[in-house]
């Protein structure tokens, strides 16, 4: 299994640039390498979820707070645009990381974060990256990942 993971990481290197840099492309490539090891379909970066993750990161930076719930109680999923119409959604947050592999590995070592990455109910993700912290100057980068799956639209046969 570990050999397959290494091969997948090397294969993604050509597409993602410096694989250590924390970028949305590198983060999703690393998450997808873990999903592939478990024979799960890959996550796809979705424009609507990316906009939502970016808006969420910006609001945290503007308000100098960090967490899954805003100080006013707003949940992370309130940022997802109505046109995404999600059936399932989740969020991973991280701060203070310098490399994408270490960031994703730390999520994989956390049961809740791992569950989001490996969740069969998720097909899409949106990723926002901020240099530093939303609470002021800090080392490393802060990352928001919103996971989702759109509702299945039923077509009337009448």
Locations of regions flagged by a protein language model:
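Sec-dependent N-terminal signal peptides
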Residues: 4-12
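Boundary at the C-terminal end of the N-terminal hydrophobic targeting segment
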Residues: 14-16
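A short alpha-helix/helix-coil micro-patch that ends at or immediately precedes a cysteine
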Residues: 19-62
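Surface-exposed patches in mature extracellular/periplasmic domains of secreted proteins
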Residues: 37-51, 64-73, 114-129
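Short, surface-exposed glycine/acidic/tryptophan-bearing loops
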Residues: 51-98, 117
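Disulfide-stabilized extracellular recognition modules
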Residues: 94-158
């Amino acid at each position: 299994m570990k050999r397959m993971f290494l091969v997948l990481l090397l294969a993604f290197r050509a597409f993602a640039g410096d694989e250590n840099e924390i970028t949305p492309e590198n983060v999703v490539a690393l998450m997808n390498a873990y999903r592939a090891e478990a024979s799960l379909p890959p996550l796809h970066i979705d424009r609507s979820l990316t906009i939502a993750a970016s808006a969420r990161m910006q609001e945290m930076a503007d308000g100098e707070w960090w967490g899954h719930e805003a100080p006013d109680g707003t949940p992370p999923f309130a940022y997802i645009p109505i046109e995404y119409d999600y059936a399932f959604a989740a969020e991973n947050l991280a701060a203070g990381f310098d490399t994408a592999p270490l960031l994703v590995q730390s999520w994989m070592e956390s049961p809740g974060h791992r569950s989001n990455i490996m969740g069969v109910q998720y097909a899409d993700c949106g990723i926002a990256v901020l240099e530093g912290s939303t609470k002021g100057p800090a080392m490393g980068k802060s990352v928001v990942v919103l996971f989702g799956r759109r509702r299945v639209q039923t077509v009337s046969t009448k």
